[in-house]
Structures are given as C-alpha cells and as structure tokens.
C-alpha cells in the first residue's frame, strides 16, 4: 500500500469523510487542502447513473469555461482549406499532411490539441493508433473536426475543456487553478454542471447525477451538494 504523506494526512483531516458540502465551502476546503507546492489544478468528478456500454449512454463533448482554465493550450490546426482562417485565429501551428508525417516519423508532439478540417481525417486515420492513446485524435463531438476552425481555436484559447465518461460512468473535468478567485471557480463549476445536465441521455431512469466530488492535484476528495 502506498505511503500517505504527512501533508496529505493533514489535508485529509480537514475534510469530514461522509459530509456533503455546499459549493462555496467545498471550494474553500479545496484551496485549504491543496498539498502541492505548485499551483494545483482544481478538478470536479461526476459519478453518473449511466451505462456506457449502451451506445445512447456514451457521453462525450466539450464545454468552454467562462473564467478559463489557467493553462495555455498550444493548438495545431491541420487543414488544406482553412489555412488563412486558422492563422488569423492565432493557432500556434498550421499545416497539412507534412505535419501528419512529422508526427508519424519524428514522434513530434509540440502541441496540446489538434483541430482538423474534415478533408484531413482520412490522412489522420493513418496515425490514429499514435494519437488515440494520447487523447489527441480530433472528434466532431468535441468540436475539433470542423470547417469553422476560427471558432474552434478561439474556444480552445478561451478555455474549452473536453470530457468523456469512462466505463464506470465517471466524468472528470478541470475547472481552474487553486490560485483562481473562488467566484471564478464557482462560475466554471456552474458552467460544467449545466453542461453535464444538458447532455443527460433520454434513456436514463432515476437520478442521473449520483454524486459530485471536488479535488485538487494530489488533494483529498470533497463531496459537493448539487
């Protein structure tokens, strides 16, 4: 069993195990229990009453956080048709098949996210096994396969985050950094929970959201009222 650090034990002692906290108190506790020396990420985890084995209950998408993520994303746009629009939108890197070959042949990953126009997808499919495990494969559901590359790049730069339910029905999303003002974290949390409610599958019966947990990088989980 992994050894629990003294710092984590101290953080854990501040959180009542089975208590469900109001959002403002949960955010305050998350800041107090951040155990890292760097500016920790604040994450929210939704445990949903879904069965991801069913096609109509596989949840995936993206949401723009109104207060941003606190992280700068390097955006690669792959296109043969929207180069000018991508450059004007201030994409970090813009190119076509030559960049796909660079990823394939040079193991090049100087970017955080890929936006592609539809005509590039057949070529991208050839390196799907490289991009997929890294979570870098563009997907229409997350808005990263699109002809409107300007909007896609703008949304990412503003603070768009992607989400996907795992096989246990959990969705993990970042809502900012510990250094954010509580109001900004609250704003992002509300945007995220609104999005999760919006994508509720019609076939779900009973309670949709089972519980919500807030945490920081390497910090304890804090149950949140909803």
Curated annotation (Swiss-Prot):
Part of the 50S ribosomal subunit. The keyword Signal does not apply. Pfam families: Ribosomal_L1. Coiled coil: none annotated. Belongs to the universal ribosomal protein uL1 family. It comes from Mycoplasma capricolum subsp. capricolum (strain California kid / ATCC 27343 / NCTC 10154). CDD domains: Ribosomal_L1. This is Large ribosomal subunit protein uL1. It comes from the Bacteria. One of its GO terms (molecular function) is tRNA binding. Binds directly to 23S rRNA. The L1 stalk is quite mobile in the ribosome, and is involved in E site tRNA release. Protein L1 is also a translational repressor protein, it controls the translation of the L11 operon by binding to its mRNA. GO terms for biological process: regulation of translation; translation. InterPro entries: Ribosom_uL1_bac-type, Ribosomal_uL1, Ribosomal_uL1-like, Ribosomal_uL1/biogenesis, Ribosomal_uL1_3-a/b-sand, Ribosomal_uL1_CS. GO terms for cellular component: large ribosomal subunit. The keyword Zinc-finger does not apply. Keywords: Repressor, Ribonucleoprotein, Ribosomal protein, RNA-binding, rRNA-binding, Translation regulation, tRNA-binding.
């Amino acid at each position: 069993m992994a050894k629990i650090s003294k710092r984590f034990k101290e953080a854990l002692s501040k959180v009542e195990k089975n208590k469900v906290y109001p959002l403002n108190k949960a955010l305050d506790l998350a800041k107090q229990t951040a155990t890292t020396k760097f500016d920790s990420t604040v994450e929210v985890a939704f445990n949903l009453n879904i069965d991801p084995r069913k096609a109509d209950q596989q949840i995936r998408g993206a949401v723009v956080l109104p207060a941003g993520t606190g992280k700068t994303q390097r955006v690669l746009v792959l296109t043969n048709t929207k180069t000018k629009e991508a450059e004007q939108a201030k994409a970090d890197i813009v190119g076509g098949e030559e960049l796909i070959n660079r990823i394939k042949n040079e193991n090049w990953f100087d970017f955080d996210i890929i936006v592609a126009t539809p005509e590039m997808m057949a070529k991208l499919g050839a390196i799907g096994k490289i991009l997929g495990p890294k979570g870098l494969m563009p997907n229409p559901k997350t808005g990263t396969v699109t002809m409107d590359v300007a909007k896609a790049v703008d949304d990412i730069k503003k603070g768009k985050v992607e989400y996907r339910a795992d096989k246990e029905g959990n969705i993990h999303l970042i809502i900012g950094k510990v250094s954010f003002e509580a109001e900004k974290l609250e704003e992002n949390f509300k945007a995220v929970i609104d999005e999760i409610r919006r994508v509720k599958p019609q076939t779900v019966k009973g309670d949709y959201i089972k519980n919500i947990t807030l945490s920081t990088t390497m910090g304890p989980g804090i149950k949140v009222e909803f």
